[in-house]
From Swiss-Prot:
The lineage of its organism: Bacteria, Bacillati, Cyanobacteriota, Cyanophyceae, Oscillatoriophycideae. This is Phosphopantetheine adenylyltransferase. The keyword S-adenosyl-L-methionine does not apply. Its EC number is 2.7.7.3. It catalyses: (R)-4'-phosphopantetheine + ATP + H(+) = 3'-dephospho-CoA + diphosphate. Substrate binds at residues 8, 40, 72, 86. It is an enzyme of class 2 (transferase). The record marks 16 as: Transition state stabilizer. Pfam families: CTP_transf_like (PF01467). One of its GO terms (molecular function) is ATP binding. It comes from the Bacteria.
C-alpha cells in the first residue's frame, strides 16, 4: 500500500523524519510530498526542500520525495495512493487533522488518513520553532537533520 506524507517541510525536522521512518515500516511506499503553501513565506524553495529531504531519507529504500501543487487527494489519485500519513503532536493538531481528513473524504471517498503520534522527544517541535531559534543564533542541530541545519545556518549567516 502506498502512503502520501504531505507537508510544506520548511524545514523538515527530526519529528518529520521520525514519522517518515515509522511510516516506512507500515507501508510499502511512502511518498513525501512537498506542497506549496500560498499562506506561508518559505525559507527555502520547493526544489531545495525536495533536495534536502531526499538527502536525509536516502537510507530509506521505500521512500520517495516529490512536489505537487494542488489538492493532496488529487495527487494521491495520480500516484495510486489510498492513505495520507499525518503526524500528531498535540490535541490541537488532532482537531485540525481530523477536520482535514473528513474534508478529504468528501473530495474522494477512496482516501484514508492514518495518524501517527509524534515521538515524545519531538512533541514540542515545529518548523516555525526551528526558524525562530536559528534566526536568533541558537543551535538547531538537535532539531533537524545535519544537512538541513547546515543550510539554515548558511541562510541566517
Amino acid at each position: 500500500m502506498i502512503a502520501i506524507y504531505p507537508g510544506s517541510f520548511d524545514p523538515i525536522t527530526l519529528g518529520h523524519l521520525d514519522i517518515i521512518e515509522r511510516g516506512g515500516q507500515l507501508f510499502d511506499l511512502v511518498i513525501v510530498t512537498v506542497l506549496r503553501n500560498p499562506n506561508k513565506q518559505p525559507l527555502f524553495s520547493v526544489e531545495k526542500r525536495v533536495e534536502q529531504i531526499r538527502e536525509c531519507t536516502q537510507h530509506l529504500s521505500n521512500v520517495e520525495v516529490d512536489s505537487f501543487t494542488g489538492l493532496t487527494v488529487e495527487y494521491a489519485k495520480l500516484r495510486n495512493a489510498k492513505v495520507l500519513l499525518r503526524g500528531l503532536r498535540v490535541l490541537s493538531d488532532f482537531e485540525k487533522e481530523l477536520q482535514m481528513a473528513h474534508t478529504n473524504v468528501t473530495l474522494w471517498d477512496g482516501i484514508e488518513t492514518v495518524f501517527l503520534a509524534t515521538a515524545k522527544e519531538y512533541s514540542f517541535l515545529s518548523s516555525s520553532i526551528v526558524k525562530e531559534i536559528a534566526k536568533f543564533g541558537g543551535s538547531i542541530s538537535h532539531l533537524v537533520p545535519k544537512n538541513v541545519a547546515q543550510d539554515i545556518t548558511l541562510y541566517y549567516s
